[in-house]
From Swiss-Prot:
Belongs to the AccD/PCCB family. The lineage of its organism: Eukaryota, Viridiplantae, Streptophyta, Embryophyta, Tracheophyta. Its EC number is 2.1.3.15. Component of the acetyl coenzyme A carboxylase (ACC) complex. Biotin carboxylase (BC) catalyzes the carboxylation of biotin on its carrier protein (BCCP) and then the CO(2) group is transferred by the transcarboxylase to acetyl-CoA to form malonyl-CoA. A zinc finger (C4-type) spans 232-254. Binds 1 zinc ion per subunit. The gene is accD. This is Acetyl-coenzyme A carboxylase carboxyl transferase subunit beta, chloroplastic. It comes from Populus alba (White poplar). Its cofactor is Zn(2+). Keywords: ATP-binding, Chloroplast, Fatty acid biosynthesis, Fatty acid metabolism, Lipid biosynthesis, Lipid metabolism, Metal-binding, Nucleotide-binding, Plastid, Transferase, Zinc, Zinc-finger.
Amino acid sequence: MKKCWFHSMLSNVELEYRCRLSKSMDNLGPLENTSVSEDPILNDTEKNTYNWSHSDSSNVDHLVGVRDIRNLNVDDTFLVLGRDNKKDGYSIYFDIENQVFGIDNNHSFLSELEKEFSSYWNSSYLNKGSRSDDSHYDYSMYDNKYSWNNYINSCIDSYLRSQIGIASSILSGSENCSESYISTYILGESRNSSETGNSRLRTSTNGSDFALKENSNDLGVTQKYKHLWVQCEICYGLNYKKFFKSKMNICEQCGYHLKMSSSDRIELSIDPGTWDPMDEEMFSLDPIDFHSEEEPYKDRIDSYQKKTGLTEAIQTGIGQLNGIPVAIGVMDFQFMGGSMGSVVGEKITRLIEYATNQFLPLILVCASGGARMQEGSLSLMQMAKISSALYDYQSNKKLVYVSILTSPTTGGVTASFGMLGDIIIAEPNAYIAFAGKRVIEQTLNKTVPEGSQAAEFLFHKGLFDPIVPRNLLKGVLSELFQLHAFFPLNHNLSRTLT
């Protein structure tokens, strides 16, 4: 006979679902972690369960999670372990083969649980002698083990649904939308899922830290709720969108730096109220009448302008960074992959020339797939034009240019101004390359080693200077500029007065 355990912990502090394995059903010792669950965290109080006086088996061969409940076989012995809000334990025991049902640890909290199964306990159908006397009895409903199993599963579903509602109601009103998603996902979507992996859901007491880890097979469900969550492309963890911007688009699960829009980067780096954009009226035309079978180039530009609210794939302007006047250009990967066309190159060139004339430090944040193919050689020409302007800025005026490489930085941007900085800073785990992995493998027919185009690997090869996380970037830039004698305006004013 196969023995199955399901461990459910419900409390005011957390709502978690975990799978654990016990050594024995007669003498339940500490619960051990298995490969089904990768989270080894268990409080001491969670490691103790209760003895079963009526159990006739000593080994547990299998364990299940929330999604596995519905896949139980008729020969399974099923045990549910749970905890109420007062941390008092209770246990529910099912022997599906022998149709045995029991509850251990008689506590007042169990009365709520008993209601879920009262329809079965009080049913005359449990008494085989009375079945023939009931005209409403459905002979096919409980006569086979599969139906009995399905009924128990429905009871468990009903009970879990009620307890999730109790635990979720503790949360404040600001998490109502998340609560709705949580309940729908566990009790609705997962019911139709064929995935057998376990799922972990955690809600903290401050109401601002939601995390739901799921396997890559759940991408369809995630897309349905993408207006609430941002999924990490590395660990597939979900980040609550409401707080994602305040966390600088850094995944709460693995710390991966996800893509940021140019507007968010400007807001992150530039002091509030000091941003003055340049050349906003410039936009791309179709200089070579690029032919496309799918969508005309002009129409594609228009669609990206409506989607992003930008006129081109870069924003340029001047502002203050901790009081230090700077000229800054930030590329936006959401606009045609941050591709560099004639307008992007012209805006960068004008920014460099302005910084040269005003003796300002220069920052260029790179996020691009390379030169824009729809503009042909005109886009390639921007590489030389920008490099020429930077030569005058760096060599003749002796000013400081800081290049910041984000993910991805590839193609013509990498081959030109991306690698020309006096100081080159990279974000953690940034994808930096000239040609992409797919292009290299198809061209050379060789496999590109995994991670060979990541910032950490290239850092050890001396390709750039520091790797700086986003939360430290503004402070690092401020110190670098002050090291090169660029000081805040109020600091210069105080020096002049003295």
